[in-house]
Swiss-Prot record:
Protein name according to UniProt: GMP synthase [glutamine-hydrolyzing]
Lineage summary: Bacteria, Pseudomonadati, Thermodesulfobacteriota, Desulfovibrionia, Desulfovibrionales
Enzyme Commission number(s) of this protein: 6.3.5.2
Active site residues per record: 83, 172, 174
Pathway as given in its UniProt record: Purine metabolism; GMP biosynthesis; GMP from XMP (L-Gln route): step 1/1
Annotated NCBIfam families: guaA_Cterm (TIGR00884), guaA_Nterm (TIGR00888), PRK00074.1 (NF000848)
Length: 515
């Protein structure tokens, strides 16, 4: 198979480095992010077609600031430096830096200068809006560089060395706020680097199936199915590669949504002929959760119990060599961050403890992909919309949406309320417009009036948010008529609820889930 065209992105700690990778991939070119400690020899061995230097929060003059190995600029491939990357490049090649009197954050109007290929197709007679986020700046470009962009406060907002195909911009072309950002990145990829747009999900599927078949050979793989898109795509890809030597296990932990377990199992068995075991372990999980109110304790109990159950079921299969997981590219990036993983806000429920416990080799077919790419792969595989566009659902399930103690009665109330939320979002056309929507059962009761009588019953909170990647989120501005209909149905149809409230908190400072 012909080698994949590849762009290497060097990460200097910007919060939006992943956006660079996504913009490149959206253009049909494969990209990888590597920490700034990577060496020029390591990058050379990756055979990149181009290199992009990301932004970052540091100042080039700081003692512990990330550095740039000069060899990265001598690979003979085009280079695009962004923000901190531009300052680092300017410093290394003999330019002069200065500290801005005030840090510049937000929009700026860029004047395009000269005949720079980055500006191809952009109207040069007017300014274009870009997004800035910097403290330092390049005061004098290095030898061989021409100034190709300026703003009212920045004489060197962009510079270019056409002979060496090295370009630098002080703004962030990867963010949506930069009006011509996508065009600028595409101009770098196709007009400067002259790359091929050969990264497609159909080519990924073909390659993934071939590689998994070669890796597994005649051995067996076990896969934990949750019914979510990631594990389902992993299972279907593996099934195409190795057939019945894939063993899927779906564990019902007792905190799934209404009828969810049986519906998922029935669909996957019927449409994909998966070798699938449905383990009904509800009682085992709920007994361990009895009386537990602390959310972190709930997560740990569910995680540890899942590992116990899954381990028992996998051992019962006999000899299995591989464990399949739905690891995505953001997980991989986080694990090799230039500063190490970020602070843990909540423990993540996954099967991370299984490979060591079971002595299995990991197989992670989606580790190159972002979430939106997984959805495209699902489409290539013929998965239905209800799986492709299913809202994210936490591993601990409803256990962290029942605030406080978990009981059968409280789970029943939440399941019925959540079913109404999902149904109304779908029937109104809002389900695919929002990132996530669900109900939360609060640990309190309030006074109400129904008919001629006083009530003292439970409160349901609605959490419906807009997001791109769950890193940040904002509450969804749903029509008041839709919110009214959801509230009315829950109060009238779910016994034990007399009040519905709408969560209008953003992330940050709040998280999407309540626990």
């Amino acid at each position: 198979m012909e080698a994949q065209t590849k762009v290497i992105i060097i990460d200097y700690g910007s919060q939006v480095t992943q956006l660079i990778a996504r913009r490149v991939r959206e253009a049909g070119v494969y990209s990888e992010i590597h920490p700034c400690i990577v060496t020029a020899d390591q990058v050379r061995a990756m055979k990149p077609a181009a290199v992009i230097l990301s932004g970052g929060p540091a100042s080039v003059g700081e003692a512990d600031a990330p550095t740039l190995e000069k060899g990265l600029l001598e690979l003979g491939v085009p280079v695009l430096a962004i923000c901190y990357g531009m300052q680092l490049l300017g410093h290394n090649l003999g330019g002069q830096l200065a500290t801005s009197e005030t840090r510049e954050y937000g929009p700026a109007d860029l004047t395009l200068l000269g005949d720079c290929p980055l500006w191809d197709g952009i109207d040069k007679s007017a300014t274009t809006r870009v997004w800035m986020s910097h403290g330092d700046k390049v005061k004098t470009p290095p030898p061989g560089f021409a100034v190709v962009g300026r703003t009212a406060t920045l004489d060197v907002a962009a510079m270019a060395d056409d002979a060496r195909r090295i370009y630098a911009v002080q703004f962030h072309p990867e963010v949506h706020h930069t009006e011509e950002g996508t065009r600028i990145i595409n101009n770098f990829l196709f007009h400067v680097a002259k790359l091929k747009a050969d990264w497609t999900m159909s080519s990924f599927v073909e390659r993934a199936i071939k590689e998994m078949a070669e890796t597994v050979g005649d051995r067996h793989v076990v896969c934990a199915l949750s019914g979510g898109i990631d594990s389902t795509v992993v299972a279907v890809l593996l099934h195409k590669a190795i057939g019945k030597r894939l063993h899927c296990i779906f564990v019902d932990n007792g905190v799934l949504r209404l009828n969810e377990g049986q519906e998922v199992v029935d669909y996957l068995r019927e449409h994909f002929d998966l070798n699938l075991k449905y383990v009904q372990a509800q009682r085992r999980f709920l007994d361990k959760l009895e009386g537990v109110e602390d959310p972190e304790q709930k997560r740990k109990i569910i995680g540890y119990t899942f590992i116990e159950v899954f381990d028992e079921e996998a051992k019962a299969l006999g000899h299995v060599d591989f464990l399949a997981q739905g690891t995505l590219y953001p997980d991989v990036i986080e694990s090799v961050s230039h500063k190490g993983p970020s602070a843990v806000i909540k423990s993540h429920h996954n099967v991370g403890g299984l490979p060591e416990k079971m002595n299995l080799k990991l197989i992670e077919p989606l580790r190159e992909l972002f979430k939106d790419e997984v959805r495209k792969v699902a489409g290539e595989l013929g998965l239905p919309d209800f799986i492709i566009w299913r809202h994210p659902f936490p591993g601990p399930g409803l256990a962290i949406r029942v605030i406080g103690e978990i009981t059968e009665e409280r789970l029943d109330i939440l399941r019925k309320a959540d079913k109404i939320v999902q149904a109304e979002l779908m029937s109104s056309g809002w389900y695919r417009k929002v990132w996530q929507g669900f109900a939360v059962l609060l640990p309190l009761k309030t006074v109400g009036v129904m008919g001629d009588g006083r009530t003292y019953e439970h409160v349901i909170a609605l959490r419906i948010v807009d997001s791109v990647d769950a890193m940040t989120a904002d509450w969804a501005r749903l029509p008041s008529e839709l919110l009214e209909r959801i509230s009315s149905r829950i109060i009238n149809e779910v016994k034990g609820v007399n009040r519905v409230v709408y969560d209008i908190s953003s992330k940050p400072p709040s998280t999407i889930e309540w626990e």
